[in-house]
């Protein structure tokens, strides 16, 4: 082994270790790897930067734009509303329909975008059917990953595998080359989940909403879910109260006393007719840090009795306990929803204060659930992370503002989730026509795939299906930069002999056992790697190895590359294996073992199906 080869393996090892550690962003790690290859002289600048001009990278960026166009025009949301009408209350039927609709969408949209659309719909359906969302959300994520196996554009690993063939002067996979195998995998996953898998899923998330058919949990249920005190009290401000004129921000009760102000109401008009104000006439509305208190205000407070008494004594308040679920206690125009930031949300790595949450949306964050723990103190200074679940209080009008932030957040427990209109719903027929035209052109290969995707992406903007700002925000830049920066690693392995060394080792170990053993080995290696690092990075690193292995064994590279593509999409077994798993972690109140228990079995089933079907459809 030469010095350059050893150096490349060291850089690759450090890169993979940083991927697994999750200490740094994946795209940053890939760029660091690229710079290391440049600084050590292993790659020349043109070789190192070739990934950014690769048609694969440009095509994936274009597909994100097309997917965002479908998202913004509500194509996916319409399917979700149909699901709401057709699903009924049967758990088996719900699981089956959720998986079918989700897989269909993720065959043409990104899996993350699909889950972001379907998540609030599925949670609302679960509550309507009195079923725990935990029973439906893992099937949702698995269907999104299985659906990505059904078309060439379903997931980046499919494109990576096809691009490997094209780069070697061979025809790439056709648009529907993945469809028979993808449908078979979906059927296997569907049968497994409705017969066995659903019994292994927990019923941890609350199953019953606050009212019949509301699809929204009650205050008491949310208090239990977020480990908040369920005791609710009403305190009235006397005319001489020292609190009059002070704002909630000045008081700082959540931080100082662990007491939340849920709402501000007034005494009946007949009693305080002489002190009517705009707020009194409205009876109640959402409140925020700048809300100033007035004499006669009635505050709806939540907290432990001892904390409430502490506040009452300190500020001379008259306090009485109330039933939070009694009619009229919590004003009708106020409610609670859970909000999740998306993987590409602009909220990430910012505090609630920096986001001006109350000023922008007219809501207040009551609690944040992170890594299974509830945070109620210091919320204004809390930095938002992907995977957080925010418990938000506000009016339905405010929730509508939140729901419009489709690229930044997913709103759960919202009664309007099933009826919500997309911001550009009137452009849906145009977006659908563009999508169909792109598929036809790619199927018949009239122009290169990258051209078809590029034209479709531009047409989405020109026809008003989305704006250029939406297009830029819709692109998963982390994935694009990751692919562009990691592709040269394959070049470095090839020119230093590292690729041949890896292939020789794989062939020496599994070659004597035949091509089926090689398929199994590649599947296991790819599937295990995809649980801990990006499935796209896994495919980029293993596709060249699969191709060279096929040449050394004197077999067709098509079945081996298809196996790598399929295995890269089996990120079922851990909550961090894929962004879609992380997205449902909070709403489903899942634990690591929930994914492991169901995911490993499904991986084994997909492995068995791959070994059976791939050699039949793509002979050696």
Functional labels for PLM-detected ranges:
Residues 15-24, 101-110, 143-153, 440-446, ...:
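Transmembrane alpha-helix interface/packing and boundary motifs in multi-pass membrane proteins
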Residues 20-21, 27, 387, 424-501:
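Core alpha-helical transmembrane segments of integral membrane proteins
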Residues 128-139, 147-221, 226-229, 301-302, ...:
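Juxtamembrane and boundary regions of transmembrane helices in multi-pass small-molecule transporters
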Residues 230-422:
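Structured cytosolic domains appended to multi-pass membrane proteins
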Residues 1-4, 46-56, 171-182, 422-424, ...:
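Interfacial loop-to-helix junctions that mark the boundaries of transmembrane helices
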Residues 33-34, 80, 112-125, 137-141, ...:
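Re-entrant/interfacial helical elements at transmembrane boundaries that shape
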Residues 28, 33-35, 39-129, 189-202, ...:
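Membrane-embedded alpha-helical segments and adjacent helix-loop junctions characteristic
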Residues 92-104, 131-147, 178, 515-528, ...:
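Alpha-helical transmembrane segments of multi-pass membrane proteins
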